């Protein structure tokens, strides 16, 4: 979900009642996608990894970014890449990693459209991560993903209840926001606001929503869960099986 930011940034993450449990929900920004503003058209989206010390005082409450290298386990990058690949396999989106220039959060930058880093979000039991909707949404904040540095992160996706959260699953959820999807009330959907390891990656409703925004993938087939190297906005603590996502 979107963290509570400056008023110029669109907020995300709260379930809006009543929501029907039958369809994806597109985010509130306009045009609400990358590339052409026309729904159903593809896009190339860049992404970059923010360095420790990057200023994010423009976020509600203020913060300083910690690089993923400094709080995630070795091998995390593969899970980030797999999360991007899970979306490009089902929708007409191409992702390209670029260098991050170190500019402050929401400032003018030549970094990726989606910038990824972490900061303290209050510790275990609260928000796991948050992701910002696409343009127009503040300055360069649109699309950015931030993880909670105080939670435990895992390369595995084994449902062991060890208190750690799947980097792949949470990243895929947050990328969904960064590309234009809101939370959905549809059960067993990646964009449902509760963390679960009952399934892997985008599900039918998530895929339908992303294809509505960007069109179907030009090449390739839907990935099988076994083909993904298994390892948001926020998850609210209800145990490992159910925690609210942003």
Residue positions per predicted region:
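Short alpha-helical segments used as structural interaction elements across diverse proteins
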Residues: 1, 173, 239-241
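A short, hydrophobic C-terminal helix/tail in secreted or cell-surface proteins
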Residues: 223-241
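Short, charged juxtamembrane terminal tails flanking transmembrane helices
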Residues: 243-246
